[in-house]
């Protein structure tokens, strides 16, 4: 019996030593990225996200109204310029002095917005920008257009042309020149 007890005690001691050494073993840490990699990642995140933050701030400023403020309109409604831009105009960089502008912030997250561009004998176009301020489309011919997200599934009325834009937040700028004399 003493022999069995001695063997069991020896095995228990060896097992305990093995468990203790396993518990105290150094754990391997994942490699820490170098400063250059961290800087590149942060720079890419900034370049990607900053336009989205700036667009959202601009949208909030431009649409924070009940519709009675000059120069602002609620989402999915037009803000039509009441006069031509002059030297004091600072909202858009280098606006044309012979062009009347309209702006609308669109939310197409649930359904498209239909935009009707009438026939005109003057220069007129509608520039659609995505949330990164990239031009997603330019409408320059008379017609009815449905501005939609690429994944939207639904039927459009006859005669309506679908225009896909990549983000649910879209801003439209309509440019209409004055008649020539």
What residue ranges belong to the model's regions?
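Positively charged n-region of N-terminal signal peptides that target proteins for export
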Residues: 1-4
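Bacterial N-terminal signal peptides
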Residues: 9-18
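C-terminal motif of bacterial Sec signal peptides marking the signal peptidase cleavage site
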Residues: 21-22
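Short, conserved catalytic or interaction motifs in soluble domains
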Residues: 25
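N-terminal low-complexity, Pro/Thr/Ser-rich intrinsically disordered segments
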Residues: 28-40, 44
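Glycine-rich, compositionally biased intrinsically disordered regions
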Residues: 43-141
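An exposed acidic His-Trp-rich patch
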Residues: 130-173
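Conserved small/polar residues in nucleotide/adenosyl-binding loops
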Residues: 174-180
